[in-house]
Amino acid sequence: DDGLRERLLVIVGSDKRGTIYGLFHLSEIFGVSPFVNWCHVMPVHRDEVRLSTDMACIAKEPSVEYRGFFINDEWPAFGTWSEHHFGGPNAKAYEPIFELLLRLKGNYLWPAMWSARFEDDGPGLLNAELADEYGVIMGMSHHEPCLRQGEEYKYLRGKDSIYGDAWNFKTNREGIIRFWEDGLKRSGKFENVITVGMRGEADTAIMGKGATLADNIELLRDVLRTQRKLIQENVNEDLSKVPRMIALYKEVEAFFYGDETTQGLIGSKELCDVILMLCDDNYGNLRTLPTEEMRKHPGGYGMYYHFDYHGWPTSYEWINSSYLPKIWEQMTQAYDFGVQKLWIVNVGDIATQEFPLSFFMDLAYDFERWGTTAPNTTDAYTRLWVKRQFGRLSEVQQAQIADILTDYTRMIHKCRPEALRPETYHAANYREGSRVLAEAGRVMQTAQDLYDELERDAPEILPAYVALVWYPAMGTMNVLKLQLLSGMNHYLAEIGALSANDYAKEAKACLDADQKIIEQYHRSDDARWYGMGLSQHIGFTNWNEDECKNPLLMQVLPLQKPTIIATVDGTVQHVEGSPWLNQRMTISDFLNPECRCASISLYSRSELPASFRVIEKPEWIVLSAMDGTLDGEENKRLTIDVTVDESALAMALTDGRTQGMIRLELPAGICKISVPVDRSTYEYGNNTFVDTQGWIAIEAEHYSRCKDGFDREGQPMQWKCLAGYGKTLSAMKAFPTDSYADAENGAPYIEYSIVTKQAGDYEAEFYMQPSNPVTTENRLQYAVSVNGVPMQILDAVTDDFKIGDHQPVWARGVLDQIRRRSVPVQLEQGINTIRVYPVTPGFVLEKIVIYPHGNKPAEAYLGPTETYRCRS
């Protein structure tokens, strides 16, 4: 009847999962977070909830059919956690994980597998039965075919076993077939995406090094034929009703493509209806992607992505170090290339990955909202995510949390915790170490201040805040501080400054804080996360934690005479003033017409009182101290700010330039510090970079012109800025992301205007995202044209570029999160233009540094800071 109809709340799904999604969508409308049970994110109390007819909706089909995550590398963290709370990875442990997956609108899961047996640990089949009840589609990892895990074979194998004692399809064919067959009989009745193919045990290649490519391909073809028959016999004769997937992971990718002399598995009938799961390089950079012809494959394509990895060159497993703009850039490109059937991400232990996992799942579920047509929306997503978890807090507090999440992930993604070294960031050049140290300190201070506020005013919110924000931010930034302080200690120790010992003390305090932060996380929320912080994460010297070490700290012993050493901050210049050695330094900061402040630092090298005084300087140079005494104890260091009296300077300028000299008397002698100044008025166009310091450094988004164009097919193509992307400011990338361009025939370009003092030979160094070629042709090309002369087609990688273990060029790129390529260019005196064109997909430009040949600017992890540019 009509009256009853008006009082009905109807939730209908096309299947069980659809109905569950509807229920959870309703809970989100009520303000319930997907992490309500996983992280105890408690919703706002309401006495009543009102529904209105305008809330009625029909959900669209998800953008990606199979969306999920992989629990991996689970010891010691996830393994200890599950043992401590549930007695192991059993159904009690998986129940909250299944719920979390569904609340995130996922449907697909690879279970833990290092020492776990999902189908046995329930106990028995209880894990699988519970997954089926929840509507979770199960799969097994890239090297675990036919619904059986590697640990199962390890447990069941033996000389008297019906499955034999060798994971070898050639020597133990019948045993392996029976092992697979029994797995299909046991678990094929549940909803699965069945992994097919075969790799070696424990994530290795299936055949030895002596096997040829053809040998491997033929073996894999035999395996696939056998598995196809087994699935028909034991699951469903109609294979169109049985989703199957092969992971083209590591060496399997080569078996799929073959080479110029060996036909690979591409296009083979054994794979005609199988999902082809492509992979990243384990560090968040896509490997090959489907060509336009390949996209016709009936089975569709998947992507295996990583937020966690256990492997060469350096594992990263402790705390989230993935950055949303990078995830967006890579996964939107995957989708644009037709990878739309299956997405799965390795989340390690799950804990601390909740933030990027949410984005990954939302991107897969609703690509229209968050995908390629919505660039630069990760900040908006972050604010929305924070509101979902912490809507009870004030807008100011929510904004602080959003900043913490963005800042800590941006900073730790530049170099993951395990790969950080004291020398990663330069302790002196461009003030890099001190700049990053200050930024890390700000993040930690904000996170701790907010913790204190919540502890006082809203303790019920504290458990979720600790799990989702405080612990990952404090943990990663503290390790970053530890390595930065150690680097400062090393640098100052090398020049004999006693302040090095203070940095050593601060570094030791960070090391102590590391354990305290983890212990606080483990105690939080009634020890809910006990075990999740146990992964080693400091000073990896090998690919794994073996022989990892805390930073080496140096102690400086005081000299037995009064001694001061002077430095120019932002450089490695240092002098004592001795007449027998170099007495001169230069403050070049004021060669940038926008610079208004520089500094000199004085350091004690002795515990005896040592005096200094400025005995000469021009009137226009203003110093924050003219004399003083250091004693190596209470006063070990003094920083003297150097500024300019602009009115006095104006009287000294000739053609906008001048140079002053500071004569500083130290115990060992006179230090002479040159201070050249440029206050010229450069009347060039907006974003014209002028060489005032001997080199030019350009952030990619500061182009003088950006011209749209066309791809090879005549379709519109354009450059877009990716805000916040990369290691410094942002990046530029051409869209559509799957388009190829002819640089000499209508391609879009970005143009940079630069002014040089002299004509001659220069180097242009391009800083690029460490992308990989999207095809086996091994090309990642862009083009450069200088002053309109014939352009150069350049390649970001060499002809012999390879991805994988013991490939140093690739490894350097993924560890440093940058790839650099220098190109010789001829520049004229005065204004020059450099145009950059896309050629192949995947090229992402972050920075350009230009310098005279043979005069490269000082090195630093982030590269030289941006130099002077005209602003209109």
Residue ranges: model-predicted function:
Residues 102, 107-110, 120, 278-284, ...:
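Structured mid-domain segments that build the active-site/substrate or prosthetic-cofactor binding neighborhood
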Residues 1-169, 248, 268-285, 292-324, ...:
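Feature activates predominantly on carbohydrate-active enzymes
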Residues 537, 541-605:
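Beta-sheet-dominated interaction scaffolds and their linkers
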Residues 45-47, 382-540, 740-741, 748-750, ...:
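C-terminal non-catalytic alpha-helical accessory regions
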Residues 84-86, 124-128, 153-158, 210-216, ...:
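Short secondary-structure boundary/capping segments
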